Amino acid sequence: MSKAKAVCDRVYVVGGSDLSAPEDAFVYLVDAGSELVLIDCGVGDGMSRIEENIRSLGFEPAGVWNIIATHCHIDHIGGLFAWKERYGSKIIAHELDRAGIEGENNVLTAASMYGVDYKPIYVDTLLKGEAEKHTYGDLEFNFLHTPGHTPGSISVYIDTEDGRVLFGQDIHGPFSPAWGSDLKKWRVSMQKLIALKADVLCEGHAGIYRGEKIGKYIESYLKRYEF
């Protein structure tokens, strides 16, 4: 498997299909000074590998006080229960994806696609607006409601010494009526992300994009899903 690595100032990639478990979306670690923040946590089977990857960077998994769930699909949230049980990590997610995360509607998690069971967990901080700001450690995290892939999909950005870093998980889709996907809302969401003019994009499955390649990447999917 590949090794964990720095993406830019304060940001590392610690999980993914070649880093932790084949089913995992990319998992990103943010060094917020006095605490660590995870952006998603994979399907769950690769948790021990993610822990090892965090330690390889000189951090301790116990420092992960908060986990941001970008949406309710199991390849992003399957490990939430274990992280909360082992380390007491708090979970942040949008209220429109709460039903999937908390176990009210398992179809929303897409767990059946992966052939795995999902252990529900309560969300500690429910995001409700179109945009919110929360401070963790010494960093301000900017949350944007970016529905489309799922009703409660969120994107997050932080400003670092290397510029604006955007966590835009699953920009590429896919879409399904079973999850409440909405292409019209997704297109509006993508325009929001382009307008941010981020310097670094950390995507859920496609990896890292920088500079002008970010807008081109998003535009390529806007063209693919024209209607």
Residue ranges and their predicted role:
Residues S2-L57, S155-I171:
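Conserved beta-strand hairpin/beta-sheet module of binuclear metal-dependent hydrolase folds
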Residues V37-I39, I68, I91, V165-F167, ...:
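Residue-level marker for buried hydrophobic side chains located in beta-strands
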Residues V13-L19, I67-T70, F143-T146, P177-S181:
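Short, flexible loop segments at the rims of nucleotide/cofactor-binding pockets, characterized by
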Residues S20-E23, L126, P147-T150:
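A short catalytic or substrate-binding loop motif that flags glycine-/basic-rich loops and adjacent residues
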Residues V7-G16, S112-G115, G137-F141:
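Short Pro/Gly-enriched beta-strand edge/turn motifs at strand-loop
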Residues L19, E95-A99, I171-G173:
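Short, acidic/turn-prone active-site loops that include or flank metal/cofactor-
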Residues V43-D45, V107, K133, E140-Y225:
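Metallo-beta-lactamase
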Residues D45-S48, R55-E132:
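Active-site HxH/HxHxD metal-binding segment of metal-dependent hydrolases
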